Design a protein with these regions (language model features):
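N-terminal export/assembly segments and adjacent metallocofactor-ligating motifs
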Residues: 1-459, 466-474, 493-496, 505-508, ...
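Gly/Pro-rich turn-and-neighbor structural signature
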Residues: 164-168, 181-182, 498-533, 543-550
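Flexible, glycine/charged-enriched surface loops at secondary-structure junctions
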Residues: 166-170, 306-313, 523-528, 560-569
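A glycine-rich phosphate-binding loop feature that marks nucleotide/adenosyl-phosphate handling sites
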Residues: 176, 314-319, 515-516, 530-534, ...
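Short glycine/threonine-rich loop-to-helix capping motif typified by GTGT followed
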Residues: 181-187, 537-546, 576-585
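Extracellular/periplasmic catalytic domains that process cell-envelope and extracellular macromolecules
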Residues: 228-230, 521, 697-702
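Short acidic alpha-helix initiation/capping motifs at coil-to-helix transition points
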Residues: 444-446, 485-493, 544
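Oxidoreductase and adenylate-handling cofactor-binding alpha/beta cores
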Residues: 554-558
Length: 716
């Protein structure tokens, strides 16, 4: 029956379907949780459970207030997190073990014949025809579901056979990023390391490690809390798509803009984060380093040469290596950059503990000082309280003002050799020639002086800052050499030079470099970088492009300042319980060291990628290099590093089971671990033993097992 308005009607039809919607949001209980994925957000979610199943989730907004002047941490969460509940029940998620049917049929047949598991597995892998047949089935369908016990038996049989026949160093274990789920990471790696398998590094899962953090700052990717972004008043975002990869923190970006912060985005494409940019720098992919070098050139010229910036110079003197003296090595009619001047060089300080690891500065009166804070103070047997960065002489305890540059205090100008790598290879993908172009030498003068060592020798020295000025191409005073005349001179590393590399206007490089430093001067360091894997995927990304960012920050006094800093974000590589984590996962309570290996080298050699790497290393050598390697390929350099003990590689010994090698050492009369080590070293020296890397394709030197868990090795 319908009323006259035609809007309502009375019906006898069932309305039971409404119960579905009423029950949709009912639940038995809720728990507080997060999502153990490879991100650093750690977002808090309330997970609602019904009949033992996750039915829905809700973002929580009860984070503690950090500071009344900083926006709330919430809202937190992202599209990936809100869909996480679907994954446990996805039809695409395997619920049971699966084995290639071809392999399982062979194994089941051998087991039925009365062989034990190890014998059954051995009879398959040592049969060339059957081994080839089951391996050929890879990459196709043809899985067979087996029980958990059956799968465990097959895996254990394979491991036992591999250890007995080839050695535990023929088994590799790979799993990415421990911090996203510590227990599962530890369990797998502990088991592997108790067996003596290869403990593969995990950072290469997505790109290179940011070396600059360790080499410049002494620790690995220590980044600020994301709420600290809000305090930054000048942002440069490079290689990090914040909205996409740090969604839960992206609100600080928009909030900082409301506060008046300026956002500069270095991105070849109009990415998600680019829409927030006040200045978009659409540079050629992989040319970030060139652009940043031009910014450094501008900062050095305008804030160190054209005028003195007290905040910058005070910061650089106290917190960087720029005032340290560097030896210049004579090379014909020019000089090459050498090592730092050490305390062991100077009679007054030569008796210091760890003198080779303590460095020297000078002041305006020409006096040499041993400042506190060098790494040698960190490892003194008896702490002296000098492991800090105060500008005090560690011996006399007097404060001093170090010279940042010798200009005006020099007794000579030294012509120093630098290498120009501009045209060594073409960054356009697919166009890199195999040989490339060698680096070109250019000569630039730096102010220098002579000092006398404790053994009576004379050293020509300059400061690290003077070398940086010359490297960046910043002309000063009467210094001669191949310096550019101005910003429009296309010599390294001017704004005009970067224009040819990046496709970006020189004016835009001048603008960003000037604004970055001007903001840092006025705010005492509140200029920051947010950076990530978009840069690290390139050949020199993690080492050189990142270094340019770090140098800009150091020159402008931004590191260690709220609202400043070098902020590298990728995933959750840090573990809060690191001491326990390292001991448990590495099984260090049982034996040490574990067989650690960088995964890049493992794949490079064991998948034959080195055969397809046709780039010679001509482009890598400095023009001052005196002796080049006999061979000129990355594989040769890797092999050299292994032979010299710089880099572990497994399997380790050519066509040799390390367990059998130990037995041979005992037979030879070795009674202690040290005697075994000495005996093995002697076998290598005599040529009776060789490293497996030199014949990595030999069947005896190939990996026999690779275990992958917690990650999609190929797909991601």
């Amino acid at each position: 029956m319908r009323d006259s308005s035609k809007w309502f009607s009375v019906s006898e039809a069932s309305r039971s379907w409404e119960e579905f919607y009423r029950k949709r949001w009912s639940y038995d209980y809720s728990v507080r949780s997060g999502h153990g994925v490879n991100c650093s957000m750690a977002c808090s979610w309330e997970v609602f459970v019904k009949d033992g199943l996750i039915c829905w989730e809700l973002q929580k907004t009860d984070y503690p207030q950090i500071d009344p002047d900083i926006p709330n941490v919430e809202p937190r969460g992202c599209q990936r997190g809100v869909t996480a509940s679907w994954y446990p029940y996805s039809p695409l998620r395997p619920k049971f073990p699966y084995v290639r049917k071809v392999l399982w049929d062979f194994y089941a047949e051998e087991r039925k014949s009365g062989k034990d598991p190890v014998e059954a597995y051995a009879s398959i892998v040592e049969d060339e025809e059957r081994s080839k047949k089951y391996k050929a089935a890879r990459g196709k369908a043809g899985w067979k579901r087996v029980s958990w016990d059956e799968s465990t038996e097959l895996i254990a049989a394979a491991q036992i056979h591999t250890i007995k026949k080839h050695g535990p160093d023929h088994m590799a274990n790979f799993s990415p990023i421990p911090a996203m789920s510590l227990l599962s990471f530890i369990s797998g790696h502990r088991y592997n390391n108790l067996l003596g398998g290869i403990y593969c590094s995990y950072y290469e899962w997505y790109h290179d490690l940011p070396h600059v953090s360790s080499s410049m700052f002494g620790d690995q990717t220590e980044n600020c809390e994301s709420s600290d972004w809000y305090l930054g008043t000048y942002w440069v975002v490079a290689g990090s798509n914040i909205n996409m990869t740090r969604t839960a923190d992206a609100h600080f970006l928009s909030e900082a803009k409301y506060r008046g912060s300026k956002i500069v985005v270095l991105s070849p494409n109009y990415s998600d984060v680019t829409k927030y940019a006040d200045t978009w720098v659409p540079l050629v992919p992989g040319s970030d380093g060139a652009y940043l070098m031009a910014c450094i050139h501008v900062i050095l010229k305008e804030f160190y040469v054209d005028k003195e910036t007290p905040y910058f110079t005070d910061y650089v003197k106290q917190y960087t290596n720029q005032p340290f003296l560097v030896v210049l090595d004579k090379d014909g009619d020019k000089y090459q950059m050498g090592r730092f001047v050490r305390a062991s060089d100077i009679a007054e300080y030569a008796g210091e503990e760890n003198a080779d690891w303590k460095l020297i500065m000078t002041d305006g009166e020409g006096k040499l000082h041993l400042p506190t804070g060098s790494v040698g103070f960190r490892w003194e047997k008896e702490p002296t309280g000098n492991w800090n960065l105060q500008l005090k002489n560690a011996v006399t305890r007097e404060e001093f003002d170090p010279l940042l540059t010798l200009l005006g205090n020099e007794d000579r100008n030294a012509m120093v050799s630098f290498s120009n790598f501009t045209d060594t290879f073409n960054i356009d993908m697919g166009k890199t020639q195999g040989k490339g172009q060698k680096a070109v030498e250019f000569l630039r003068e730096v102010p220098a002086k002579t000092i006398r060592t404790n053994d009576g020798k004379e050293l020509v020295v300059t400061t690290a800052f003077d070398l940086l000025m010359a490297q960046a191409g910043v002309a000063r005073g009467e210094l001669g050499g191949d310096y550019p005349e101005d910003y429009n001179d296309p010599k390294p590393y001017t704004p005009a030079w970067q224009e040819a590399q990046t496709g970006v206007s020189r004016d835009l490089a001048i603008q960003v470099g000037r604004e970055f430093a001007d903001n840092a001067e006025k705010t005492k360091g509140k200029s920051l970088f947010i950076t990530g894997p978009g840069i690290q995927h390139f050949y020199h990304g993690a080492s050189l492009y990142y270094r340019n960012e770090a140098v800009m920050l150091a020159l402008c006094g931004c590191n260690g300042v709220n609202g400043g800093n070098f902020n590298h974000y990728v995933g959750t590589q840090h573990t809060r319980l690191n001491a326990a984590f390292v001991n448990l996962s590495g099984a260090l309570d049982w034996s040490r060291p574990p067989r650690l290996m960088n995964t890049t080298s493992l794949w490079y050699f064991h998948t034959g990628q080195w055969r397809y790497d046709n780039m010679s290393l001509d482009t890598q050598w400095s023009t001052g290099a005196k002796k080049l390697p006999e061979f000129n390929h990355a594989a040769d350099m890797n092999s050299l590093a292994v032979r010299l003990g710089w880099l572990p590689f497994f399997p380790q010994v050519d066509k040799t089971n390390p367990m059998e090698l130990y037995k041979d050492a005992v037979k030879a009369g070795c009674n202690s671990d040290q005697e075994v080590k000495d005996w093995v070293a002697g076998q290598f020296r005599s040529g009776k033993l060789n490293f497996a890397i030199n014949d990595v394709d030999a069947p005896e030197n190939r990996l026999k097992m690779v275990t992958v868990y917690r990650g999609n090795l190929i797909g991601t």
